[in-house]
Amino acid sequence: MLPPSVTLRPQPLLTDTDLLLYNLIRLAVEDHYLVFARVPLWSVVSVEGDGKVRLQVLRQIALKQLDFVLVHPGTKVAEQVVLLEDGFPPQPHEVSRRQDIQSVLQAAGITLTILKPQTSYTVLQLAQLLGVSEDE
């Protein structure tokens, strides 16, 4: 299957910063959502339509990856997506990626929240940003 000259090794799924944010998000939403990391965009939406158009949309979203997905434990449907925006200002390819993801999520009725990994968040702040705080 693999050419002899190719070597595969496991690699970390999350950076240290991503893992910290993952744990904070998990604590903030633990009574409301399941949290998944590094999820392909195509796996959270159902693309329905005629053959060619459907394939075109699937190709457009095929390699797009979501940083964190919040899934309702009862319906098992993604209700919110968290994207991390590293650079300021964001690079043109990051802006394009975010716009593509944003339009797909909006069409599917999935909420998008953008976080800056270099910002320090508390569990309460994240709960408020993600709409699960007790105050609401």
Per-region residue spans from a language model:
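Basic, amphipathic alpha-helical patches used to engage nucleic acids or provide basic targeting signals
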Residues: 69, 73-128
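Short, mixed-charge, low-aromatic patches
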Residues: 22-26, 55-62, 80-86
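Generic anion/oxyanion-binding catalytic loop in active/binding sites
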Residues: 10, 57, 115
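Non-catalytic C-terminal interaction segments of nucleic acid-processing enzymes
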Residues: 1-10, 120-136
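Active-site metal-binding core of divalent-cation-utilizing nuclease and nuclease-like domains
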Residues: 13, 37-77
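Generic signal for short, ordered secondary-structure residues
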Residues: 3-4, 47-48, 54, 83-84, ...
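Intrinsically disordered, low-complexity Ser/Thr/Pro/Gly-rich regulatory segments
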Residues: 16-19, 23-33, 37, 95-106, ...
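N-terminal topogenic membrane-targeting module
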Residues: 1-49
